[in-house]
Swiss-Prot record:
It comes from Influenza B virus (strain B/Yamagata/1/1973). The chain crosses the membrane at residues 5-27. InterPro entries: Flu_B_M2 (IPR006859). It comes from the Viruses. The keyword Lipid metabolism does not apply. Phosphorylated by host. Residues 1-4 are virion surface. It is a single-pass type III membrane protein. Influenza B virus genome RNA segment 7 encodes the M1 (AC Q71UK7) and BM2 proteins. Normal translation produces the M1 protein. The M1 termination codon overlaps the BM2 initiation codon in an overlapping stop-start pentanucleotide 5'-UAAUG-3'. Termination of M1 translation triggers reinitiation on the BM2 AUG in the +2 open reading frame. The record marks 19 as: Essential for channel activity, possibly by being protonated during channel activation, and by forming the channel gate and the selective filter. This is Matrix protein 2. GO terms for molecular function: channel activity.
Length: 109
């Protein structure tokens, strides 16, 4: 049986991870918006447009990879910690689903 302090520590860790994940996703979205706003092509030609599209595609792929990595890390940690977390009325699967829901909500913003 876990001590109340241990339970609080685990819950605190999960909340910190969720906060960090939300901040990171928000920060990546701001970078993406900033990149989109800074692109102004003067005298566009096919080469310039292709280069700018390539830069945007690369930035977007990096953002998606970062989100997937965060999701994997959180999911792994939630699965490990769910065996030790007891929230009255919630199963381990429901706790993991809560973490995934937070990720989905953050992705929408």
């Amino acid at each position: 049986m876990l001590e109340p302090f241990q339970i609080l520590s685990i819950c605190s860790f999960i909340l910190s991870a969720l906060h960090f994940m939300g901040w990171t996703i928000g920060h990546l979205n701001q970078i993406k918006r900033g990149v989109n706003l800074k692109i102004r092509i003067r005298n566009p030609n096919k080469e310039t447009i292709n280069r700018e599209v390539s830069i945007l595609r690369h930035s977007y792929q990096k953002e998606i990879q970062a989100k997937e990595t965060i999701k994997e890390v959180l999911s792994d940690n939630m699965e490990r910690l769910s065996d030790h977390i007891v929230i009255e009325g919630l199963s381990a699967e429901e706790i993991i689903k809560m973490g995934e829901t937070v990720l989905e909500v953050e992705e929408l913003h």
